[in-house]
Amino acid sequence: GHLESSNDAYAIAKIAGIKMCQAYRKQYGFNAISLMPTNLYGPNDNFDHNSSHVLPALISKFHGSLEKSKHWVVKLWGDGSPKREFLHVDDLAEACHTCMQDYEGDEHINVGTGEDVTIKELAETIVDVVGYENDYEWDTTKPNGTPRKVLNVDKIKSLGWEPKISLREGIESTYEWYKAVSYTHLTLP
């Protein structure tokens, strides 16, 4: 399909990486494997809500607002309708191991859960995990981005790999890590 205009440079870089692996394989006989992971999250992520991806940004925003007054409202971009797929980094590590052991092909492999959630559902889960009790609202003057991003993961599943960490479990463990490393120094706008 067509590339999302807000993300086309990143998509082109991914395509270039796939082509490079294929060229190394053909020219040098190097068994390069190109993996295309979905949205990743987990320990050591970037939690700066101004520059991070949506999941760690939401953890940062809601956690950073726990001590605010009852009148504080967290503002979230868009309307919450876009759908995204998320994969915990530990599941990606297992997928890499599986592919190194069991894959000899030259086509790229999508790595994900094959399941998506709306950004609204993601926010509701994070609100519950963090224990945020104040209001939040959607700022529809901000962009939604691509309506839906979910990968076809049939190829990696045919190798016997399946993700083990549910989205909620992953958010819970990521939030525990986040609190343990004291990311409370991040400030809200």
Regions found by a protein language model. Name each.
Residues G1-S34, N39-Y41, D45-N50:
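Catalytic helix-loop patch of NAD(P)-dependent Rossmann-fold dehydrogenases
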Residues I15, K26, F62, K149-V150:
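Hydrophobic alpha-helical segments, especially transmembrane helices
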Residues I15-Q22, P56-S60, A93-E94:
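Conserved active-site helix of classical SDR/Rossmann-fold NAD(P)-dependent CH-OH oxidoreductases
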Residues C21-K26, F62-H63, T187:
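Catalytic Tyr-X3-Lys helix of short-chain dehydrogenase/reductase
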Residues L40-G42, V54-L55, L92:
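Conserved sequence/active-site signature of Rossmann-fold short-chain dehydrogenase/reductase
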Residues N50, V54, T118:
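Short acidic-hydrophobic sequence patches enriched in Asp/Glu that either
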Residues L58, G64-L186:
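C-terminal substrate-binding subdomain of Rossmann-fold SDR/epimerase-dehydratase oxidoreductases
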